[in-house]
């Protein structure tokens, strides 16, 4: 069977789809599927995979890129039996008007909401955005993301919460399927932080992701300003890049935290492993997450979790059973002082910390095993 996969980001890009697509393409190829990927890219790269990767330059005239992408999907989708859409949804739908192929869509978020936050057009929570009215630009974007989803034969989401959201876009329940994200489970036990020996240990926090408005990295940095009043030896690793990088670095400098907050830039999955291994606490302050793969990775490396209870994150934290929760103020972002208090509580609660870490590890093995969950996708295509 021939399968065409479309995606907006692909390695060396960083993000959920960029991590997922190579894995599912590899699995499909190993099971005798003929796979072609069409993706956007910042520069041409020679790919040496057993599947075909067709890259389209991202930074060019938008109309020209759209036309080129649509024609590329038509060309490579002509002999395909299935189009698996992980990005480029409108281009894929327009191409499929002519192709009339089975179309499976994976939805991991709401690009209309992300666009509104990135452009500073809105300052509201993900869930509020779904029901509120907005300007014409955003209403068109909301219509587009929902309408293209309804045209798919099946829509897969990585969380029950997101499945409910997509159902409200107009996709019928019998077309929806939840397949959780997963991580490769391995024995990666690291030395836990011992607060009794703080004089010789540095407590390392880490947060990973795109430096975008809804990630609320500014709140995490502000909480570090409070933390240093009680803890001397600590560092925060901010892994990733994005539109707010310059602003966040300026904030760090103004707070005098340049020696405490380390911006690493984008890192490969192999490079990221070392940061996980050398950290003790993972902090997520996002206003929304579909189902964050980084939380699963953090569990795999025995990090204690602090997270906002948003989207699919609560399906990982399970109302505080597997980590600590920090509430959002007005549904948008946490309060930095509240976050700093929770961090101190985590450090001073060894028994509770160990119990939650154990619970999280058990959940990872039963619900978020990457190998098991990828096989669920394989079953979809085999059917």
Predicted regions and their residues:
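Conserved donor-binding/catalytic core segment of Leloir-type glycosyltransferases
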Residues: 4-6, 156, 197-215, 220-224, ...
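Membrane-proximal helix-turn-helix segments that form the acceptor-binding/catalytic region
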Residues: 71-78, 127-155
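Short alpha-helical donor nucleotide-sugar binding micro-motif in glycosyltransferases
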Residues: 77, 149, 266-267, 274-279
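Acceptor-binding helix/loop patch of EC 2.4 sugar-transfer enzymes
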Residues: 104-143
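Nucleotide-activated donor-binding/catalytic signature segment of Leloir-type glycosyltransferases, i.e.
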Residues: 249-267
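Aromatic "clamp/platform" in nucleotide-sugar-dependent glycosyltransferases that forms part
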Residues: 287
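Short hydrophobic beta-strand element within catalytic cores of glycosyltransferases
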Residues: 304-307, 317
């Amino acid at each position: 069977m021939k399968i065409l996969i479309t995606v907006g980001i692909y390695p060396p890009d960083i993000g959920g789809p960029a991590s997922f697509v190579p894995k599912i393409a590899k699995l499909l190829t190993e099971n005798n599927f003929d796979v072609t990927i069409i993706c956007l890219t910042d520069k041409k790269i020679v790919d040496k995979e057993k599947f075909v990767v067709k890259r389209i330059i991202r930074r060019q005239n938008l109309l020209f890129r759209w036309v080129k992408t649509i024609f590329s999907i038509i060309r490579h989708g002509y002999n395909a039996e299935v189009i698996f859409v992980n990005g480029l949804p409108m281009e894929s739908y327009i191409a499929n008007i002519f192709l009339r192929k089975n179309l499976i869509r994976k939805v991991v978020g709401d690009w209309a909401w992300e666009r509104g936050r990135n452009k500073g057009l809105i300052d509201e929570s993900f869930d509020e955005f779904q029901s509120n009215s907005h300007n014409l630009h955003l209403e068109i974007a909301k219509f587009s993301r929902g309408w293209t989803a309804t045209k798919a034969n099946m829509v897969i989401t990585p969380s029950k919460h997101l499945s409910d959201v997509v159902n409200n876009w107009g996709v019928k329940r019998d077309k929806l399927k939840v397949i959780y994200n997963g991580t490769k489970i391995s024995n990666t036990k690291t030395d836990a932080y011992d607060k009794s020996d703080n004089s010789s240990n540095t407590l390392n926090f880490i947060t990973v992701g795109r430096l975008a408005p809804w990630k609320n990295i500014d709140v995490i940095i502000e909480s570090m300003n409070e933390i240093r009043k009680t803890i001397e030896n600590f560092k925060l690793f901010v892994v990733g890049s994005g539109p707010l990088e310059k602003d966040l670095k300026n904030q760090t400098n103004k707070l005098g935290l340049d020696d405490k907050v380390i911006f690493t830039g984008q890192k490969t999955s192999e490079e990221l492993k070392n940061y996980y291994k050398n950290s003790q606490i993972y902090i997520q302050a996002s206003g929304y997450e579909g189902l964050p793969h980084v939380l699963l990775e953090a569990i795999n490396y025995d990090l204690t979790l602090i997270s906002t209870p948003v989207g699919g994150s609560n399906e990982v934290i399970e109302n505080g059973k597997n980590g600590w929760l920090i509430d959002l103020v007005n549904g948008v972002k946490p309060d930095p002082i509240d976050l700093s208090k929770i961090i101190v509580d985590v450090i001073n609660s060894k028994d509770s910390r160990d119990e939650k870490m154990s619970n999280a590890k058990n959940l990872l093995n039963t619900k978020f095993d990457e190998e098991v969950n990828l096989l669920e996708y394989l079953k979809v295509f085999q059917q």
